[in-house]
Regions:
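Switch/coupling sub-region of P-loop NTPases
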Residues: 108-212
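Residue-level detector of structured alpha->beta connecting loops
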Residues: 89-90, 164
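Walker A (P-loop) phosphate-binding loop of P-loop NTPases
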Residues: 99
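P-loop NTP-binding catalytic core
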Residues: 2-89
Length: 212
């Protein structure tokens, strides 16, 4: 176990390394360092046993594919179906709870894309960029910075359409940018994105509420 002083020192070093502000005014840190995704909440809003406390979590991203055609996660029939959907440039929205493998499934679909496909990935933490190790696609990764309107998800989605990609991958849609995702689909640019949802039936309502 580590104490609060050690935790604060560790997160301070991470924020300095990634050149991200972490303070009372910027109380949430969400960054990637190598294969580690780190999310921290400042002590100004974090509580443990009713006391102010910095809290953080570390998620280790696997550099090796967790979902493959041989992993048993996808049946042969489903694998063939996804290959047809990718070949036909069909847009897809992946829904599920936190930790259910939405990002890993995105990576699985990315690896099925044609090596000549030009792919633009829009991500907060560049976790999807690791698929380069197992893909021959022309991948361009853009990192979202919510502190600047010029690099928000909405702005980057609109700019991506000017780049005429074969695929636009939005790592996660969380709010009004879902409208830009829909508009992109309507213009013929296929998109793959993820959302948090309880089940498939709740996904249309969830997406509608993001837009409204």
């Amino acid at each position: 176990l580590i104490n609060q002083m050690e935790a604060r020192d560790f997160i301070r070093q991470i924020s300095n390394l990634t050149e991200q502000q972490f303070s009372f005014q910027n109380p949430i840190l969400d960054v990637t360092v190598g294969k580690y995704r780190i999310n921290a909440v400042h002590q100004s809003i974090g509580r443990v046993n009713n006391r102010q406390a910095l809290t953080f979590s570390i998620r280790i991203a696997s550099l090796e594919p967790k979902i493959t055609d041989d992993s048993g996660f996808v049946s042969r029939e489903l694998s063939s179906l996804f290959e047809v959907l990718i070949y036909s440039h069909c847009s897809m929205v992946i829904g599920g709870l936190t930790g259910t493998g939405k990002t890993e499934f995105q990576k699985y679909l990315l690896r099925k894309m044609n090596e000549k496909d030009r792919v633009v990935i829009i991500d907060n933490v560049l976790e999807l960029d690791q698929v380069r190790l197992n893909s021959d696609c022309d991948i361009n990764s853009w990192q979202v910075d919510d502190r600047s309107p010029n690099s928000s998800i909405q702005t980057l989605v609109k700019n991506a359409l000017r780049s005429n990609p074969d695929w636009l991958i939005v790592a996660e849609a969380r709010g009004p940018e879902m409208l830009d995702v829909f508009n992109s689909m309507l213009t013929g640019h296929p998109i793959i994105t993820t959302i948090h949802a309880q089940n498939m039936e709740s996904m249309p309502i969830r997406m509608t509420r993001m837009i409204m």
